[in-house]
Amino acid sequence: MIARRRFLVALGIGIALAPIGAIAADPSATSFVEAIYAPYQVKDGKGNPLDSDAAVKHYFEPRVAALIIRDRNKAAKRGDVSTLDMDPFIDAQDWDISAVDVAVRDTGAEKAVATVSFKNLGKPTTVVLDLVKLRDGWRIADINWGRKRTLRALFIKR
């Protein structure tokens, strides 16, 4: 009885002292991100082409999806290339992806950050996805490639 009480007290103290960021993220957020990167790891995989409005809306929250779609439509009318001239998930146009590691942490109510590290053509790459949970699942709110501008900033500044 005393041993059980000590265990419960120690467990309670451990939980109370654990940093908030160390609490496990929603497993569905991790599954969402892992599903994004799975097609890149298959030999001759097609990745995740953002060639339709439905595809864009599947991965991005509504405001970012609208920015991407509007930009793509304007570029098509001009006969030009859209602002997003590379694959935003891997920060490249070509790929041979290996050693993918996905780390997701909760950052608030219905929000999370996923840090995705991988090798592309042998070069270490890290992409950070800001995630938001909507009624129909997790979506990307922004992408940071370690440069000055994020995905959202590419379209807002334009």
Segments (PLM) and residue ranges:
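Short, low-complexity N-terminal intrinsically disordered segments enriched in polar/charged residues
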Residues: L11, P19-D51
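Low-complexity, intrinsically disordered terminal/linker segments enriched in charged
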Residues: T107-K111, T115, K119-V128, L134-R135, ...
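N-terminal export leaders
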Residues: R4-V9
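Short, solvent-exposed secondary-structure junction/capping segments
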Residues: Q41, G45, L50-N73
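Surface-exposed, charged secondary-structure patches
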Residues: F60-K123
